[in-house]
């Protein structure tokens, strides 16, 4: 089995090849990128059991956490998930075909619809979210509560910086 190339090894290769370039940011960003990829893979283990993608889970979860009647507009989903309309449309089509949500016409506006969980979608997301939370708990198990709080604060600062400067 090939040795896993650590981010620090990659950065050292850059230092060797480009000693004139300060590649220090690569240590943090490279690690964040790797961790993000590994987290996505770990989360997908739960989603794939239910034949869901991460985005499809996010759509169902967005509807579920809004409370009864578990219906919102497509634009609210787009804003909540930071995705574009074309991505949303294909995901909604698949979730609707699976019977987990439906498009509900809005009275007085023939062009607009709300997206609503079906009873089957409600039952599904309730099952999946329980496993999802346990999976997330396992992913974060190396950290103490204090470390998780600190990590969240640090990542929150990066998130805020990126949102404010895009």
From Swiss-Prot:
Where is the major localization of this protein? cytoplasm
GO BP annotations, alphabetical order = regulation of DNA-templated transcription
The record's section on Pfam families has: MarR
Tell me what controls its activity.
The presence of PecM is required to ensure the full regulation of the pecS-pecM intergenic region by PecS.
* Keyword set includes Kinase: no
Q: Any idea what a deletion of this gene does?
A: Mutants display derepressed synthesis of both pectinases and cellulases. They also produce an insoluble extracellular blue pigment, indigoidine. The survival of the mutant, in which indigoidine synthesis is derepressed, is significantly higher under oxidative stress. Mutant is much more aggressive than the wild-type strain on potted S.ionantha.
Q: Which GO terms describe its molecular function?
A: cis-regulatory region sequence-specific DNA binding; DNA-binding transcription factor activity
Q: Which UniProt keywords apply?
A: Cytoplasm, DNA-binding, Repressor, Transcription, Transcription regulation
Q: Where in the cell is it found?
A: Cytoplasm
Source taxon at top rank: Bacteria
The segment(s) forming the HTH marR-type domain are 25-160
**Classification via PANTHER family:** TRANSCRIPTIONAL REGULATOR, MARR (PTHR42756), TRANSCRIPTIONAL REPRESSOR OF EMRAB OPERON (PTHR42756:SF1)
**Function per UniProt:** Negatively regulates the expression of genes encoding pectinase and cellulase, which play a major role in virulence, and the expression of the blue pigment indigoidine, which is implicated in pathogenicity and protection from oxidative stress. Represses the expression of genes involved in indigoidine biosynthesis by binding to indA and indC promoter regions. Also binds to promoter sites in the pecS-pecM intergenic region and negatively autoregulates its expression as well as that of pecM.
Protein name as catalogued: HTH-type transcriptional regulator PecS
């Amino acid at each position: 089995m090939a040795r896993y190339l650590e981010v620090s090894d990659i950065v050292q290769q850059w230092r060797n090849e480009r000693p004139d370039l300060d590649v220090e940011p690569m240590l943090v960003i490279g690690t964040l990128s790797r961790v993000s990829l590994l987290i996505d893979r770990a989360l997908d283990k739960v989603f794939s059991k239910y034949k869901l993608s991460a985005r499809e889970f996010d759509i169902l979860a967005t509807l579920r956490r809004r409370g009864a009647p578990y219906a919102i507009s497509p634009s609210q989903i787009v804003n909540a998930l930071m995705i574009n309309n074309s991505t949303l449309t294909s995901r909604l089509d698949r979730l609707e075909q699976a019977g987990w949500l439906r498009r509900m016409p809005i009275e007085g506006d023939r062009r607009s619809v709300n997206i609503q969980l079906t009873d089957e979608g409600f039952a599904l997301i309730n099952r999946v979210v329980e496993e999802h939370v346990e999976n997330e708990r396992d992913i974060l198990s190396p950290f103490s509560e204090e470390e998780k709080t600190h990590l969240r604060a640090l990542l929150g600062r990066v998130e805020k910086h990126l949102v404010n400067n895009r």
